[in-house]
């Protein structure tokens, strides 16, 4: 009766002559030959479907490892599998060649890591600290990514590729790449939460800057560096007027048109400077417009403003013979210039320049002869030329009717 209970399947008798128990035990498994002698039980007393851990010895690499009999099949040695397990034996050449220590790139493995390259599989996704031999910085990445970038010869160091800045104040490389190395740092506002030492000089993120006149504005370091003399008194007014407090966007469009004409003429070297532009640096111009709003100081151009005649535009300036000088826009400024430079100033040349660069009531436009359909449209009371939006350009409309020209 007791023998029947032992061989019932719940308990194995361990007798190799008992076919019933032998076929249910691990001794009947083909991998029973890898059973380690360190186990306290023999495979005849262990069930094939046992979930307990037992020790095995691989016949190929001779490593000892633990496994459960219910999962023993095919290749079950973790040391023989790719990037699975590495032993700690320094004399094991098989595990050494599978570890990251056998790779030439292991020289970049930082001493800040707790694990050694000998204990980490090659091309694994384990993250660690690497030391850049170019800049001396330590950065974190996975071993697989580090090897991949070196194979395609790309810079992986975030400090060499200018993706990160370190916090070391004595690091010359990061200081040179930061905005703190630029002379424009003197305009960095204390309202910013970050230090310019921690911001790239080519950053496109907007920060607060303070001009010498006390005006604060937001701009990116890249735009600040690429701009010329943006901190100048007159350029500051230009920036304030065009970017921050501009209530009339059409003025900014006229200014862009003016710059496009200047750029086109510079390419063929036909630019001439107006001789009396320096005198205008100290004159505060008012906005010339019929739009009711609080006037803001208009900007003046600096040192190399181009002549409207040289640019190829007429400026919509009426002759001084048909219009009294006192009725010309900008006559009060002409009197100031005349008092400084004398009476030998070309009146038409001055007002042409004034209408092109200062008087935005007369925007820069080119002219051509009107067609018959355009003349009819101009005379039509329901035409767009007679709409309320064009009331502030009444002088221009009269001039267009008289000279037979149209704005294009």
Swiss-Prot record:
Compositionally skewed regions (Polar residues) per UniProt? 376-386
Q: Which residue windows does the record flag with biased composition (Basic and acidic residues)?
A: 389-401
Q: Specify where the region named Disordered lies, as residue ranges.
A: 376-408
Q: What is this protein called?
A: Uncharacterized protein R635
